[in-house]
From Swiss-Prot:
UniProt entry keywords in alphabetical sequence: Ribonucleoprotein, Ribosomal protein, RNA-binding, rRNA-binding, tRNA-binding
CC terms in the record's Gene Ontology section: ribonucleoprotein complex; ribosome
Official protein name in the record: Large ribosomal subunit protein uL5
Organism: Anaeromyxobacter dehalogenans (strain 2CP-C)
Any GO MF annotation of the entry: structural constituent of ribosome
InterPro entries listed in its UniProt record: Ribosomal_uL5, Ribosomal_uL5_bac-type, Ribosomal_uL5_C, Ribosomal_uL5_CS, Ribosomal_uL5_dom_sf, Ribosomal_uL5_N
SUPFAM superfamilies per UniProt: RL5-like
Gene expressing this chain: rplE
Record's function text: This is one of the proteins that bind and probably mediate the attachment of the 5S RNA into the large ribosomal subunit, where it forms part of the central protuberance. In the 70S ribosome it contacts protein S13 of the 30S subunit (bridge B1b), connecting the 2 subunits; this bridge is implicated in subunit movement. Contacts the P site tRNA; the 5S rRNA and some of its associated proteins might help stabilize positioning of ribosome-bound tRNAs.
Known partners and oligomeric status: Part of the 50S ribosomal subunit; part of the 5S rRNA/L5/L18/L25 subcomplex. Contacts the 5S rRNA and the P site tRNA. Forms a bridge to the 30S subunit in the 70S ribosome.
GO biological process: translation
The family this protein is said to belong to: Belongs to the universal ribosomal protein uL5 family.
Length: 180
């Protein structure tokens, strides 16, 4: 069974986007390509256990096993060695991507303290959107009692949009709560 949001996009939202953006061919309408969830763990330099806990939490949030990112080169000022683990990242595609986006928009973002909407300016010029989340505990999959340290994560939504207006229209139709 396809994800709820994907079915809604195929049946209803694609036609609305085509009409709004003036496209004739359904393949011209922008769609989600992938979502990259990244957790940078600079403090893992001193404490290796942080990586394991973060990988576990990221797997719970996304439903997919993360890749541990390693330092490309040594930087003495940061006490960083080449090959040392400094983060974790997951690339979501297909149904998992739509389900994660649905949970992010409908459950996680409304749980952020003093949430007034996400910035409409965080597009990169090519229709992709990046969002920073300060606390991983906004996701219902994370058990607050088992969290040792509150960490943030970056979520990048990659779309097939050609420019920011198309990307903004797509995310607005998919339910992203932009600030007014």
């Amino acid at each position: 069974m396809a994800a709820r949001l994907k079915e809604r996009y195929d049946k209803q939202l694609r036609a609305e986007l085509m009409k709004e953006l003036g496209f004739a061919n359904p393949m011209q309408a922008p769609r989600l390509e992938k979502i990259v969830v990244n957790m940078g763990l600079g403090e893992a330099i001193n404490n290796g256990k942080i990586i394991d806990a973060s990988v576990e939490q990221l797997a719970a949030i996304t439903g997919q096993k993360p890749v541990v990112t390693r330092a490309r080169k040594s930087i003495a000022n940061f006490k960083l060695r080449q090959g040392q683990s400094i983060g974790a990242m997951v690339t979501l595609r297909g149904d998992r991507m739509y389900e994660f986006f649905d949970r992010l928009v409908s459950i996680a973002l409304p749980r952020v303290r003093d949430f007034k909407g996400v910035s409409p300016k965080a597009f990169d010029g090519k229709g992709n959107y990046t969002l920073g989340v300060r606390e991983q505990i906004i996701f219902p999959e994370i058990n607050y009692d088992k969290v040792e340290k509150i960490k943030g994560l970056n979520i990048t939504v990659v779309t097939t949009a050609r420019n920011d207006e198309e990307g903004r229209a797509l995310l607005r139709h998919l339910g992203m709560p932009f600030r007014q």
